[in-house]
Amino acid sequence: MQDRKPQQIARELALLSLSQLPLNPKKLTEEHLPKLVLATVRTLRAEVQDTLDNAAAELQRSNDRLLTSQTRASDLNTARNMLQEAISHTQTAINQLGASVEFPELIQLANQDKEVGRYAIKLVKIINEERGMIDEQITSALVDWQVTRLAQIDRDILRIAVAEMMFLNLPNSVAINEAVELAKRYSGDEGHRFINGVLRRVSDQKKALSV
């Protein structure tokens, strides 16, 4: 955490805050950030527990299937798929738990470093005020998919990156790399690859329009 730059911490705070916004985001100030993050911590804690419960249930079902099957290929394949799904659920929960360890420090840094708070608030405000344009850019880069159907954490990571590309003049490559790192911490097992692919297409489209 100590080696991370203020803007990296701010992105993480913005990501954690997006799902906990007040009804009128224009009134959002730096003082709101700790409360937003705390509310998100509570939400994520419940999500982690649900994910672990789902993983445990999948493991039990796959184990039962293996024990009761008579080595039939269909049963073994089903059990294997269930086991893989359980492992995926567990990995997602582990990622979330690992990130949650740093939440108290994130809140402290937001209070201590004004640059962190200002940039996080700027990101959140831009995403809310320009959401239509940002989502349109993301949608154009999705293949047979809609923004509204994405997992919320993936959708918010994409919105942060596109907001930085479009409105904060952050180089595309930097925005993409930062989004991928966020996805590795908060998204599912394949989330960072998906986000990288979408943002690469956004970047290519921007370059094509500027020619």
Swiss-Prot record:
One of its GO terms (cellular component) is cytosol. The keyword Membrane does not apply. Involved in transcription antitermination. Required for transcription of ribosomal RNA (rRNA) genes. Binds specifically to the boxA antiterminator sequence of the ribosomal RNA (rrn) operons. Belongs to the NusB family. It comes from Trichormus variabilis (strain ATCC 29413 / PCC 7937) (Anabaena variabilis). It holds the Pfam family NusB. This is Transcription antitermination protein NusB. GO terms for molecular function: RNA binding. InterPro entries: NusB-like_sf, NusB_fam, NusB_RsmB_TIM44. It comes from the Bacteria. One of its GO terms (biological process) is DNA-templated transcription termination. SUPFAM superfamilies: NusB-like. Keywords: RNA-binding, Transcription, Transcription antitermination, Transcription regulation.
